[in-house]
Amino acid sequence: MTKYIIVTGGVLSSVGKGTIVASIGFLLKSSGYNVTAIKVDPYLNVDAGTMNPYMHGEVFVTDDGAETDLDLGHYERFIGINTTRYNNITAGRVYFEVIRKEREGKYLGQTVQIIPHVTDEIKGLVKKAVDDTNAEIAIIEIGGTVGDIEGLPFLEAVRQMKLEEEENLMFIHVALVEYLRVTGELKTKPLQHSVQELRRIGIQPDMIIARSILPLDEETKKKIALFTNVKPDYILSNYDVELTYEVPLILEKQNITKKIFNKLGLEPKEPKVAEWLEFVENMKNPSKEVKIALVGKYTKLKDSYLSIKEAIYHAAAKLRVKPTLVWVESSDLEKSEDEINKLKDVNGIIVLPGFGARGVEGKIQAIKFARENNIPFLGICFGMQLAIVEYARNVLGLKEANTTEVNPNTKYPIITLLDNQKKIVQVGGTMRLGAQKIILKEGTLAYSIYNSPHIYERHRHRYEVNPEYVDLLQKYGMIISGVSENGLVEIIELKNHKFFLGTQAHPEYKSRPLSPSPVFLNFLSVASA
């Protein structure tokens, strides 16, 4: 029988529910339980694929090609699981399924309503995600904040689940406790009100995790307990720490797993956290520093590239180095020649993924600077494509070379739309997505990085290297070190360079704290040498 932990949020969004879910998942899995985590997003988009990164942060791609919420990245990194499309449930997907079933006559003439049809669909999607993994414990994060109108059907669905699974389900409420510096007080009133709102809906939290600058003192816990009907022992602190990866450790210091085991009637087991603790210690005690420039078009919101940032941290911990990240807005490089000076003192340059024409020439300038100055370079997805454009312009002499994504009428279409994309009109969910096989060429940098004849990495793109130019690129010294099963260029590199690698894939999605991405590990190793 699967046990369920439902995590809700109060007071404001972005209070850290995703990190809490991931941390609890890690602790339970390291205790020996089979765990899965599910993110519920109440927005009407079917998935996150068409959202602007400034609005929603990065799109996290799963092995099966789902474009999902970035919280699934937290789940994968912390818990060490591979999620699927079933681990992200959106209101758009729920309503889409309900309307489809109504049109197909699946409801046999009933009046289709929020209760029971929408709530039943939500519960069915949760069950599907759980059944797919045979999870012993499923942690479900309800996105948004208690009181949001769009979240009400999801809260009603989990309220019904509690009725059906009385002994097998618990609620954890995560809410902000603000610290007033002027008076030196922790203010609990907003948290109290958010719990009151939950109780009006019919949900009584079993545990509260208070997000605050400082740990909660015992008096504050007793005050919260009095107004929320939650025992003081079940009120925990998620206070400010240096690293997100410390959150599981501070929760376990407060005996969170014992409390969960007790509430759900599970056999108590001790979580094994020694390796995780070593990882955290390595991050906090580096032996030297490495400065990495990240060149992209969404750098004002760092969460737009969250998995890349975390992949750097994973590799840095393994190497015992401190990464200083220099965020460079690619469009700024186009404004003045002086802007390129930002790259002079860095130890490595990563050109980040991103669609569209804005900032493209700035990215190309950064690539040229890395290539000509022998600075370790990594180009990811669009970053790889633009590395080829730069090479075509400045080495092959094809000055008007471009990608047809930017200039459909370019004289030299070095990057062009994938053949199977040319007749596609629909935007959402239609790219080349998910884990794809890459065949590596022996004797290359890519082969030495992975130490394998073939690998699987996740993808998210519509454009490819134009096969008509592959021979010419190789003639002028570019190495095609990885190709797909049907011959698409997947990885490129250059000889006589410290480290110059472009990959069509997104290796950051599979990086984990205890098993860093080989690409980032090797890049950072060279950059920090």
UniProtKB/Swiss-Prot annotation:
Mg(2+) binds at residues 71, 141. The active site is at residues 381, 506, 508. UTP binds at residues 13, 187-192, 223. Residues 291-529 form the Glutamine amidotransferase type-1 domain. Pathway: Pyrimidine metabolism; CTP biosynthesis via de novo pathway; CTP from UDP: step 2/2. GO terms for molecular function: ATP binding; CTP synthase activity; glutaminase activity; identical protein binding; metal ion binding. Gene3D superfamilies: 3.40.50.880, P-loop containing nucleotide triphosphate hydrolases (3.40.50.300). ATP binds at residues 14-19, 71. The keyword Cell inner membrane does not apply. L-glutamine binds at residues 54, 354, 382-385, 405, 462. CTPSs have evolved a hybrid strategy for distinguishing between UTP and CTP. The overlapping regions of the product feedback inhibitory and substrate sites recognize a common feature in both compounds, the triphosphate moiety. To differentiate isosteric substrate and product pyrimidine rings, an additional pocket far from the expected kinase/ligase catalytic site, specifically recognizes the cytosine and ribose portions of the product inhibitor. PANTHER family: CTP SYNTHASE (PTHR11550), CTP SYNTHASE-RELATED (PTHR11550:SF0). This is CTP synthase. It comes from Sulfolobus acidocaldarius (strain ATCC 33909 / DSM 639 / JCM 8929 / NBRC 15157 / NCIMB 11770). The gene is pyrG.
